């Protein structure tokens, strides 16, 4: 799920007021008495499309039965959410519980805007997947609860692959590459649509190599694009991109790659499962030829590295209903509702034991095997500014795709990369 982060300058501007509000949570946050939390209403912000209406309605009903309190869901848009949430967390009555992008969590935790949920982790989160929970922890404390993630898969055209004589799906990166070459040799189709700036897939390749995009230099973070592991990931990206006619200076959304695929002249692309639905909406006839498989890694026993984009649930440090908020999280993250969300939306749940709910959803089944070893962008508050346009990682990729060595391209963007990492949070 693509989240374009806004400059963290807005977070910095509110840091003092957020921290001042944190901890003022005992006015109404009383423990439930004989009548539970009767008469109270919990405000929960969730992002548009993250949870179905019936999921919310059932949860609200069960929550009221359990606590005697009501829950008010308020639907938010991703566009502008960082500034809106930053402002809300600095005010007298912030949302009690809110959905937050997994890579955004560290910045809010650093400002003091999030309540410490370490006790809740011990109670309900002992079996949360480590790869999902990583983004919810900052400075050794649990500041959010992992809710779900999504990751990229190979979306492919079954007819084109069959026309090329390919009878089995690839299990390794080399097999995948050779199959794409075969498509190019035996059909008129473009083997893969891979623009030069699909940086989320590039991040996955870096993860697969065991590389890091940043490193510590004294007390600050700096670019690590010159690292040999990052260079190896870049060479892999370039090798596959050379099989594509896609522009080297555009990303997967310019134009939407699902719409390109819908024309029926492309063998595959690397994207989110929902991009298959985009293709079908553009050309319903493509549905019968649409398939998904896990991005193959160097060996058959381990999928390619993937970027895990998703959401956490957090409690505002300034909420006056923190005990009630934790009761909400216990229910929302229970197997019933966590599994139900996975089934309804095809997202990867926070426990591996709940992945059985993905059965029958071809895109989700293809994504699940890689989730356990996937990772995110660097989970540091300083990262937020890096992703703002023009993203220096995109600039780096385009430079390599157009002929520069990874080392020279890394040197080209290093100044801008480091400047962004140095911005005050």
UniProtKB/Swiss-Prot annotation:
This is Diacetylchitobiose binding protein DasA. PANTHER family: MALTOSE-BINDING PERIPLASMIC PROTEIN, MALTOSE_MALTODEXTRIN-BINDING PERIPLASMIC PROTEIN. It comes from Streptomyces coelicolor (strain ATCC BAA-471 / A3(2) / M145). A lipid is attached at residue 21 (N-palmitoyl cysteine). It comes from the Bacteria. Induction: Strongly induced by (GlcNAc)2, (GlcNAc)3 and colloidal chitin. Repressed by DasR. Transmembrane segments: none annotated. A lipid is attached at residue 21 (S-diacylglycerol cysteine). Disruption phenotype: Disruption of the gene decreases (GlcNAc)2 uptake. Mutant shows higher chitinase activity. Null mutant shows medium-dependent development, only failing to produce aerial hyphae and spores on glucose-containing media. Under conditions that allow sporulation, highly aberrant spores with many prematurely produced germ tubes are observed. The keyword Signal applies. It is a lipid-anchor. The complex is composed of two ATP-binding proteins (MsiK), two transmembrane proteins (DasB and DasC) and a solute-binding protein (DasA). SUPFAM superfamilies: Periplasmic binding protein-like II. InterPro entries: SBP. Keywords: Cell membrane, Lipoprotein, Membrane, Palmitate, Signal, Sugar transport, Transport.
């Amino acid at each position: 799920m693509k989240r374009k982060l806004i400059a963290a300058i807005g977070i910095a501007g509110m840091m003092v007021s957020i921290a001042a509000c944190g901890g003022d949570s005992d006015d109404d946050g009383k423990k439930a008495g004989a009548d539970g939390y009767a008469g109270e209403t919990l405000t929960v912000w969730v992002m548009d499309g993250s949870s179905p209406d019936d999921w919310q309605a059932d949860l609200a009903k069960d929550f009221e039965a359990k606590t005697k309190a009501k829950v008010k869901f308020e639907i938010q848009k991703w566009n502008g959410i960082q500034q809106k949430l930053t402002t809300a967390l600095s005010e007298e009555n912030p949302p009690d519980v809110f959905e937050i992008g997994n890579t955004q969590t560290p910045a809010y935790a650093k400002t003091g805007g999030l309540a410490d949920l370490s006790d809740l982790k011990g109670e309900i989160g002992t079996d949360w997947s480590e790869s999902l929970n990583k983004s919810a922890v900052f400075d050794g404390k649990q500041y959010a609860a992992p809710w779900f993630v999504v990751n990229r898969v190979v979306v492919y055209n079954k007819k084109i692959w069959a026309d090329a004589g390919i009878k089995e799906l690839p299990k390794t990166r080399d097999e995948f590459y050779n199959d794409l070459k075969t498509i190019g040799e035996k059909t008129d189709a473009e083997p893969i649509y891979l623009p030069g700036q699909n940086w989320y897939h590039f991040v996955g390749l870096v993860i697969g190599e065991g590389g890091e995009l940043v490193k510590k230099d004294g007390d600050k973070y700096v670019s690590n694009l010159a690292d040999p592991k990052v260079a190896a990931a870049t060479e892999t990206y370039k090798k596959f991109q050379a099989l594509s006619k896609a522009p080297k200076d555009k990303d997967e959304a310019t134009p939407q790659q699902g719409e390109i695929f819908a024309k029926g002249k492309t063998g595959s692309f690397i994207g989110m499962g929902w991009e298959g639905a985009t293709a079908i909406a553009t050309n319903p006839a493509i549905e019968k030829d649409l398939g998904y498989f896990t991005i193959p890694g160097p060996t058959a026993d381990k999928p390619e590295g993937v970027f895990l984009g998703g959401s956490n649930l957090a409690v505002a440090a300034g909420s006056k209903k923190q005990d009630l908020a934790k009761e909400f999280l216990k229910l929302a993250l229970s197997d019933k509702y966590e599994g139900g969300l996975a089934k309804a939306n095809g997202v990867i749940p926070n426990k591996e034991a709940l992945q059985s709910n993905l059965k029958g959803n071809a895109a989700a089944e293809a994504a699940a095997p890689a989730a356990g070893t996937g990772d995110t962008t660097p989970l540091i508050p300083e990262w937020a500014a890096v992703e703002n346009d023009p993203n220096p990682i995109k600039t780096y990729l385009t430079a390599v795709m157009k002929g520069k060595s990874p080392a020279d391209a890394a040197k080209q963007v290093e100044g801008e990369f480091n400047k962004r990492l140095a911005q005050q949070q």
